[in-house]
């Protein structure tokens, strides 16, 4: 199988790239038609592959379960198996995206796996902190030359514009791409 490079799609996109979580082939087609740069699936949604030319980013416990994908999300919180899973992904030709919730996880991921792509999530946000603020708090610790994806499933157009101004390369959402970018990528 020829894998499509998620990193290339993000880097070559105009402005901030939008990655959309879909559950089926229709969702993948709609996301592609709306201007998404990539599709996010669970490893169980492998039947999406024949219906899109966009790179597929899979969430899944084992790289083998994501064989139809082009990249796989690994959890930095899983320190015990992160390095072994990253090696297995490399053997399978899958790009690695390491999901981090805090500075400690980011430091561990950079030291032990050194991923090209880092997924910043707001899972560890304090109650008074917005998910957007949490992601933006993590961004300065991502080294230059790495691609940063923000995981904000309920992002608004204003959130996407703020993420782009801050230097985020892509945003992972669960919603309608057109509502976030309108006729194109936000101008900032």
Language model segments and positions:
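Beta-stranded membrane pore/translocator domains
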Residues: 19, 27, 37-41, 97
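Glycine-enriched alpha-helix->loop->beta-strand junction motifs that scaffold or abut catalytic
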Residues: 34-38, 52-55, 67-72, 88-96, ...
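Short beta-strand/loop segments at the ligand-binding rim of alpha/beta enzyme cores
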Residues: 9-19, 49-61, 69, 87-98, ...
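Active-site-adjacent beta->alpha loops and helix N-cap segments on the catalytic face
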Residues: 1-6, 41-62, 74-90, 104-108, ...
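Catalytic cores of alpha/beta
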Residues: 27-30, 62-72, 103-113, 144-148, ...
